[in-house]
Structure formats: C-alpha cells, structure tokens
Amino acid sequence: MPIKILMPVLSPTMTEGNLARWLKKEGDKVNPGEVIAEIETDKATMEVEAVDEGILAKIVIPQNSQNVPVNSLIAVLSEEGEEKTDIDAFIAKNNNVSPSPKTDANLPKPHENIAKVEEQVAVIKHDASKIFASPLAKRLAKMGNIRLESVKGSGPHGRIVKQDILSYTPSTVHNKIVSRNPEEYRLVPNNNIRKIIAKRLLESKQTVPHFYLSIECNVDKLLDIREDINKSFSEDKSTRISVNDFIILAVAKALQELPNANASWGEDAIRYHNNVDISVAVAIENGLVTPIVKNANQKNIIELSREMKELIKKAKDNKLTPEEFQGGGFTISNLGMYGIKNFNAIINPPQSCIMGVGASAKRAIVKNDQVTIATIMDVTLSADHRVVDGAVGAEFLAAFKKFIESPALMLI
C-alpha cells in the first residue's frame, strides 16, 4: 500500500514552508533515517528524514515550491510491485495542494518593457532629415547630449535604437555619452524568512507599547580582563573571548538579579521565566535569526563563548534546529561592530525586552572632578510597558552596568 510523505511541522508557529530541494529522485530506494529533502522554514533550512522504507514512487510537490501547507502530501513511497495506476489513484484521493514553484516568471521585467517599446512604437519622421529613432534612443541621446544626425542606426530601415546610442563614440571631446541603466530597479522575490521578519516586526510595532531606556558603560576593565584571558589561551582560537560574550553573560547575571525583566506577555497572564535563556541576533545572508544561549547564567565565560561560536556558525550555515532558535526570554542585538553608537531595537514578541548594543569608543568623562579618557559603550533597552515598568527596566540596566564595569563579579 502506498505511504504518504507529508510536509513536516518543524516549529509551533509554522503553517507553511518552502520545499527547497529533493535529495532523492523518483524510483530511488529509501531507507528509514535517510535525508530525502530540504525544507526552508521561517528561520533555517531543515533536513527531512524518511520514516519508512520503500521506493520513492512519486514526487507530488517539486523542489523550489513555495508556501506549501504543513501536513500536505509532498511525495509517495511504494512497495515493490505496486502499479502506477494505484499510485495515481492514491495521490488523487489524498492530494489537496497545488505546487507553487519559486519563479519570477510572473514578475515584470524592465528589459522586456524596453524591447516592446522598441518593437511596437511607430516610426517617427523628423522634418526633412528623415531621422528614425525609437523613443528610448531619443531619451538616451538627449541625456548624453548626442545629436541623432551623427548616429548610424542599426535597426530596421536604419532606425536608431538603444544600443546605437550606448555604443556611440563621439567624434570630438565635446560630445560625451552619459550612460544610464534603463532598468530602474530589479525585483527579488521575498523569501520565507523575510516574510516572517516583516510580519512579526510589523505586529510588534503596531501592538507592543515600546519604551526605551539608555545607559553608558565604561568597558576599560572588561577590555583588560578580556585581553588577559585571550593571552592565556592564545594557542586555542576556539577559546578567544569577544566583547559580546561578556555582554551576554552580564545580561544573564542581571536577569538573575531582576527576574521581573525575564518575562513574556500573554493575554491572560504574564509568563515569568524560571530559566535564563537569551536570544542573540545574528545577521545571515537571507535576513536575521536569533539563536538561544540556554541557561546562560549557569555558564562560565569560556563555555558561553564556545557555545555562541557554534550557534553563529550553524546560523550562517542554515543548520539551526528548532530547539536552538525557538523560545528565549530576552534578546540582545549588537551593532557595535558596524560603528553604530546607539539604536532602538524592535521587541521580538512575546518577549518583553530587547537590548541594543552600540560601539565602544574613547570619550572624555569626569571622574573625581577630573576630566579623563575612558572607553564608553552605549546600550538601549526596548521594553514592553505591559510587562516591564520603567523602574524595573532602570534597575535591570543598573545591574547590567554593574557587571560590565566590574567584570570580575560575573567571573566568580
């Protein structure tokens, strides 16, 4: 009897996904545990393993298909000797989804519009000189200060077309071509990750009452301790500590002291998290993901750094599992490496807080009534006022500042 292969549910919020690639073809033998396809979810590309043994009799949904509903039929396994008519009847009975191939065939293409203009426009007669030119060629000639009389047309009946203008070489230095790309834009279809980011962030800005608190942190002591640790492990690059590792640990320790900031909004109740699980924003080629450092308050700086390096690598390779990016009680977004001084990040619902971290820079400060130089880092907390009151947010930032400016406290 034929066996269904269904579009898997890879996360609690997943309702549809993109079937990125088939790793088996029709007629191939399939064994339990073999990877047969790759599914693109809102956060990563996941591998699909076969559960049953059989022959891949029919691929119902081709690769590069978008928006395939979960639990819909994507392929059929058969046993040896089953007839094709039985397979076709089985598919007709169980299939209720039409594939939506990932294609830009229906998107308007600017160069096609240009071609149509050149092919369909009527030939225009210019006074007694009888110069024939397409409207596009005339526009380009005007932009480049080119006299049409000096251009030889290569189109039908000597008609001047776009390419004649673009390839024209002036006879004097006074005639100069200004080449402009006639295609004003290019269209890139939104992938699943970009659609989810757009949906969730729009929902956040429209429904979550954000408020923002900022604070400056002196990171001179932190930079000194970081240098000492990295010198101690100079031969082992996997143990090199980043400033962001210290920031994650400082947030974890601050949340341990201020558990009211480690919370999520619900219509009927606020959820206060017993575990300190911190989401860290990581930029990838197709958008943004937030892998989670779980129980961050229980890890030392070396353990946390190694785990974060592994999560970043998996994120950039699209290899994160759902357990590694779903959940979390607090998010960190660090744009300091781009030279950004400060910014207001958008909360990731249902979380109630996200902290934006800016670049560290030397500034003049007053200490003991004396002007001195210190390395200062700006951080801004975005908080959901339904969950976190202003005083709680301020107390959290004060605790974070304490750990950053006295890093030995979080290494004990």
From Swiss-Prot:
Family annotation (Gene3D superfamilies): 2.40.50.100, Chloramphenicol acetyltransferase-like domain (3.30.559.10), E3-binding domain (4.10.320.10)
Naturally occurring in which organism (per UniProt): Rickettsia felis (strain ATCC VR-1525 / URRWXCal2)
PANTHER family in UniProt: DIHYDROLIPOAMIDE ACETYL/SUCCINYL-TRANSFERASE-RELATED, DIHYDROLIPOYLLYSINE-RESIDUE ACETYLTRANSFERASE COMPONENT OF PYRUVATE DEHYDROGENASE COMPLEX, MITOCHONDRIAL-RELATED
Entry's Gene Ontology molecular function annotations: dihydrolipoyllysine-residue acetyltransferase activity
UniProt enzyme class: transferase
Lipoyl-binding domain: residues covered: 2-78
Name the UniProt record assigns to this protein: Dihydrolipoyllysine-residue acetyltransferase component of pyruvate dehydrogenase complex
EC number: 2.3.1.12
Matching Pfam families: 2-oxoacid_dh, Biotin_lipoyl, E3_binding
Domain of life: Bacteria
Lineage of the organism: Bacteria, Pseudomonadati, Pseudomonadota, Alphaproteobacteria, Rickettsiales
Family in the record: Belongs to the 2-oxoacid dehydrogenase family.
PROSITE patterns: BIOTINYL_LIPOYL (PS50968), LIPOYL (PS00189), PSBD (PS51826)
Record note on quaternary structure: Forms a 24-polypeptide structural core with octahedral symmetry.
GO aspect biological process, one term: pyruvate decarboxylation to acetyl-CoA
SUPFAM superfamilies according to UniProt: CoA-dependent acyltransferases (SSF52777), Peripheral subunit-binding domain of 2-oxo acid dehydrogenase complex (SSF47005), Single hybrid motif (SSF51230)
GO cellular component: pyruvate dehydrogenase complex
Modification N6-lipoyllysine occurs at: 43
Function, in words: The pyruvate dehydrogenase complex catalyzes the overall conversion of pyruvate to acetyl-CoA and CO(2). It contains multiple copies of three enzymatic components: pyruvate dehydrogenase (E1), dihydrolipoamide acetyltransferase (E2) and lipoamide dehydrogenase (E3).
Active site residues according to the UniProt entry: 385
Keywords: Acyltransferase, Lipoyl, Transferase
Cofactor comment text: Binds 1 lipoyl cofactor covalently.
Domain Peripheral subunit-binding (PSBD) per the UniProt entry, residue ranges: 132-169
Cofactor: (R)-lipoate
Catalytic activity: N(6)-[(R)-dihydrolipoyl]-L-lysyl-[protein] + acetyl-CoA = N(6)-[(R)-S(8)-acetyldihydrolipoyl]-L-lysyl-[protein] + CoA
